[in-house]
Design a protein with these regions (language model features):
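Active-site pre-lysine segment of PLP-dependent enzymes
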Residues: 128, 144-153, 165-229
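PLP-dependent aminotransferase class I/II
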Residues: 45, 70, 219-299, 303-306
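Conserved PLP cofactor-binding pocket of PLP-dependent enzymes
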Residues: 15-23, 307-311, 315, 332-352
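Conserved PLP-binding catalytic core of the aspartate aminotransferase-like
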Residues: 288, 300-332, 348
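PLP-dependent enzyme catalytic core of the Aspartate aminotransferase-like
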Residues: 173, 327-332, 337, 341-377
Length: 377
């Protein structure tokens, strides 16, 4: 196939100058052990498929009609789950769309937005797309976030919590502190992985999610996703929680781009997922248990493992040659994520898989270690 030649003469200067986000690799090979994009190793609640099937079997004719523009049933279910008013809940076509609307709704060109320098790589893309100045605040040596480093004028702060790709958790006390010190700016807490987080020993926090703060702090907006803990990455459903004024701003912006972001099937499936709390709690705990066992096994192999509150772990091989390890694993059909960036290029981000996937990974790493030892003997 000949190489596609791109003619940019009809492009806007914005399109010409963008540096788009690069999605995680989605290879399609048999017997692949895919541990690179933080998908849930377990299927969604069976009730999701049942709800979607019911729509197709009983309401297929209604697919000619537009879906509910505000996803009323889903928002009501989420409001009940978090003990909120429905006007404090927003839903969109994946949390990536929700985050894009956040940048468009709250961050100003006149004042910068602050974010950690090592975090979700979509944030700089949003900033560039919407013409917002993004100042990236360096993480501490141990990859933690120092709230005092954010004491500067800004139109907002966005922090992934747990952070990605480190998996570290910022306390609710620190989030409340940021909100208090920046009372005229929106503090966005991106909680894509929060359902895998646990209250740390010695913490004064009774909970881990900043949703618990939004009634006290009117400038905190929390985003979440159905992609990770609810195993619905293929359905594309995200949400935001905040005071009614923040949610109204998102709704106005949403209706200026796409008034119907969630189709009928996505709304039905996502609502069923929210209502099946038993399955949700069970699978989240399974991932946490698998994360703990994988952490122990990698530590035994002399890998430095950061304390993770997500469905992935961030690890450093003893010799720091993460790129070589990733390449060697790929040759055996095991895909993990390596970031060729300063400060983290010696680390790998590894999704927590099923017990079988984790065992396959550990066995491959053990074999690599034995081969390396044989070469040096």
């Amino acid at each position: 196939m000949s190489e596609l030649k791109i003619d940019t003469r009809l492009w806007s200067s914005k399109a010409r100058n963008l540096s788009p986000y690069v999605p995680g690799e989605q290879p399609q090979h048999d017997n692949l052990c895919k541990l690179n994009t933080n998908e849930n190793p377990f299927p969604p609640s069976p009730k999701v498929g049942e709800a979607i099937t019911k729509v197709l079997e009983q309401q297929a004719d209604d697919l000619r009609l537009y879906p509910a523009p505000e996803s009323d049933d889903l928002r009501a279910a989420l409001a009940q789950l978090y003990d909120l008013d429905v006007n404090q809940v927003f839903v969109g076509n994946g949390s990536d769309e929700v985050l894009a609307l956040v940048f468009a709704s709250f961050f100003l060109k006149e004042r910068p937005v602050l974010a950690p320098d090592i975090s979700y790589s979509f944030y700089p893309v949003y900033a560039q797309t919407f013409g917002v100045d993004l100042i990236q605040i360096p993480l501490e040596e141990d990859f933690s976030i120092d709230p005092d480093a954010y004491r500067q004028p800004c139109s907002g702060i966005i922090i992934a919590n747990p952070n990605a790709p480190t998996g570290l958790l910022l306390s609710l006390a620190d989030i409340r502190k940021l909100a208090g010190e920046h009372s005229n700016s929106v503090i966005v807490i991106d909680e894509a992985y929060i359902d895998f987080a646990q209250v740390e020993a010695g913490s004064a926090d009774a909970q881990v999610s900043a949703v618990s703060l939004i009634n006290d702090c009117d400038n905190i907006l929390v985003t979440q996703t159905f992609s990770k803990s609810r195993s619905l990455a293929g359905l594309r459903v995200g949400m935001a929680f905040g005071n009614a004024s923040l949610i109204e701003a998102l709704t106005r912006m949403k209706n200026s781009f796409n008034s119907y972001p969630l189709d009928k099937l996505a709304q039905a499936g996502a609502t069923a997922s929210v209502l099946d709390t038993a399955y949700f709690e069970q699978t989240c705990q399974q991932v946490i248990d698998l994360r703990q066992s994988l952490t122990a096994e990698l530590t035994a192999l002399d890998y430095q493992v950061l304390p993770s509150h997500a469905n992935f772990i961030f690890v450093r091989p003893k010799d720091g040659n993460a790129s070589a390890v990733a390449s060697a694993l790929r040759e055996q059909g095991i895909i993990v994520r390596h970031f060729d960036k300063p400060r983290i290029n010696e680390y790998l981000r590894i999704t927590v898989g099923t017990a079988a996937q984790n065992n396959r990974l550990i066995e491959a790493l053990q074999a690599l270690q034995k081969n390396a030892e044989a070469v040096t003997d």
